């Protein structure tokens, strides 16, 4: 029977027993970033007395909910079982473990959700750890601060910090969660020396930020980029702290706050409303709450981090979907249809140029049934998490076979740094002489 109760650095925790695994839901990895802690880096959680009942998912960061009849509302957010209670008190993680004892040292998969840094949460209907547990991998999913809550930079905040920087709280949340996992996952049967960080869209951009940051040295064993990462993709934005502060000043002016004290007393729901208004009034600022180069979390731009060899020297797997670009109208208008795809290949070739192991690159081309959206941005998630049964879409035996193939590929990579099963080499690394890309689709 999988571990049901265990002791962390902060206290005893009890999970929910399932068939062959246990899920620990809503475990705090930081203090609630509320009140005076709004717009501050995360702090270690307080220790607790007794047994923490990890039987329900934590609240999610305040955000605008998708309309039920919108594309993504229908795709991922209709099931009430996966609804979201919103609160700034949102820094929680979830753990799915099949381990029967704390000394098993199973590989760990650390998932960061996407959503343009404005939406999303750790327990969306497409995320689940059951299939990974079946394959001997522990899955961790996290909530982190979003939008203004996660990225607001401002001269007031930079001065208050005492070190002349602000913003990036969302990524610092992710680092705090990663540190928590590094320090505590052994109690759940995990190997703290074998952690694969992976994410999709904004989650992928987060992963690329983490492997480019000096703050995560020796914490990440492997990384998977899904639909946004790579070299020269046209997506990752090199935002100087000064620009982030200017955007923050514009937002604060819109809010009417005359001081940090006032800014911190604005209700969370009002912040979300102001965020939406800010995007309408300043369309060019719609996706401006992103990581900034503060000479702490990031010391240079994303492409420079690659060319200068500042990224982690670890195994990488990365890819895109055939219709990813549909959610990036600015790239579509420029005709950059292959930007993300090419960026994945460019990343692997850059690794090779640095004298490192080239990456494994994939291209997901399955056009999902039910409409004409094709292999849309995030369509691979149902497959690589093994949650196709939760989707409203029609499926074929080929879809389930593809899902099994992808779950095997992902978990093989998490175990060994190679997506191939032991003794096989069907999926080859992408090199200058042989730029191999694994196409993921149903078998004809």
Name each model feature, range by range.
Residues 10, 173, 191, 293-294:
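Acidic/polar residues in short coil/turn loops that connect beta-strands
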Residues 1-168, 192, 283-285, 397-406, ...:
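Non-catalytic accessory segments of hydrolases
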Residues 428-444:
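C-terminal domain-tail junction helix/linker
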Residues 22, 88-91, 172-175, 179, ...:
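A structural signal for well-ordered alpha-helical segments within the folded catalytic domains
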Residues 145-148, 198-202, 362-371, 425-432:
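Short, solvent-exposed turn/loop segments enriched in Gly/Ser/Thr/Pro and often Arg
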């Amino acid at each position: 029977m999988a571990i049901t109760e265990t002791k962390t650095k902060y206290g005893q925790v009890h999970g929910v027993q399932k068939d062959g695994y246990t899920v620990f839901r809503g475990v705090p990895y930081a203090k609630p970033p509320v009140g005076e802690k709004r717009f501050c880096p995360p702090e270690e959680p307080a220790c607790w007395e007794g047994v923490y009942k990890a039987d329900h998912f934590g609240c999610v960061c305040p955000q605008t909910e998708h309309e039920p009849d919108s594309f993504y509302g229908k795709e991922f957010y209709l099931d009430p079982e996966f609804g979201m209670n919103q609160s700034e008190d949102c820094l929680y993680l979830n753990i799915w473990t099949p381990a029967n004892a704390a000394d098993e040292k199973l590989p760990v998969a650390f998932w960061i959700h996407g959503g343009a840094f404005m939406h999303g949460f750790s327990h969306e209907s497409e995320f689940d750890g059951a299939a990974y547990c079946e394959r001997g991998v522990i899955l961790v999913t996290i909530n982190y601060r979003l939008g203004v809550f996660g990225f607001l930079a401002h001269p007031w905040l930079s001065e208050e910090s005492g070190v002349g920087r602000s913003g990036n709280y969302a990524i610092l949340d992710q680092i705090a969660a990663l540190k928590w996992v590094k320090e505590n996952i052994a109690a759940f049967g995990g190997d703290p020396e074998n952690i694969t960080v992976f994410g999709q869209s904004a989650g992928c951009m987060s992963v690329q930020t983490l492997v480019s940051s000096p703050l995560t040295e020796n914490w990440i064993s492997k990384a998977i980029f899904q639909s946004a990462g790579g070299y020269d993709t046209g997506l990752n934005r090199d935002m100087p702290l000064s620009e982030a502060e200017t955007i923050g000043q514009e937002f604060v002016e819109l809010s009417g706050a005359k001081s940090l004290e006032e800014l911190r007393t604005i209700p969370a729901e009002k912040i979300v409303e102001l965020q939406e208004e800010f995007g309408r009034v300043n369309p060019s600022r719609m996706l401006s709450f992103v990581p900034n180069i503060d000479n702490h979390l990031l010391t240079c731009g994303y492409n420079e981090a690659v060319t200068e060899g500042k990224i982690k020297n670890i195994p990488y797997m990365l890819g895109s979907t055939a219709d990813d670009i549909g959610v990036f109208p600015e790239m579509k208008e420029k005709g950059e249809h292959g930007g993300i795809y090419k960026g994945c290949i460019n990343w692997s070739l850059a690794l090779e140029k640095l004298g490192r192991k080239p990456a494994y690159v994939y291209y997901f081309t399955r056009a999902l049934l039910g409409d004409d959206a094709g292999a849309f941005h995030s369509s691979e998630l149902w497959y690589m998490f093994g949650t196709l049964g939760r989707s409203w879409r029609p499926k074929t035996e080929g879809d389930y076979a593809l899902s099994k193939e992808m779950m095997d590929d992902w978990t093989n990579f998490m175990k060994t740094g190679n997506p191939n099963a032991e003794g096989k080499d069907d999926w080859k690394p992408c090199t200058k002489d042989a730029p191999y890309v694994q196409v993921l689709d149903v078998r004809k």
